[in-house]
Amino acid sequence: MSIKQKRSYRRIYFTEKVKFGYDKPIYNGMSVDLSPDGMNVISDKALVPLSNIIIDIYVKKIKADHTEKLEIIRVEGEVIWGKHFPDAPSKMGIRFNNANEELIRFYKAKIPRSK
């Protein structure tokens, strides 16, 4: 069974700032894609697979006056896999430990609607 078959939600393309770390988010990265149960992250710092981590996901929300507001959604997760590339950023696959209601609402607002 592939990783894609194990996912409860399909991933959406999502490139925004993230911060992550073992005890607190101290390393910078960029998301590649996102779902309520996980994400891929590109960073100069890759953490060890099977590590428990904390991730701050920076999301842009549109306020009533049509201006952008930056909010942080904090999730706990586990590094499932990591790929290290010479002279290039590393990539990590993260599985979130628990469904986060705020993240689910954000995800549902971003998924393309069928006509």
Where are the predicted features?
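N-terminal helix initiation/capping motif
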Residues: 1-34, 44-46, 108-115
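Short coil-to-beta-strand transition motifs
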Residues: 13, 25-26, 66-76
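Short, conserved beta-turn/loop elements at beta-strand boundaries and strand-helix junctions
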Residues: 23, 36, 82-87
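Loop/turn positions that initiate beta-strands
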Residues: 50-52
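Short, charged beta-turn/beta-strand-edge "cap" motif at the junction between a beta-strand
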Residues: 58-63
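C-terminal output/interaction extensions
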Residues: 85-115
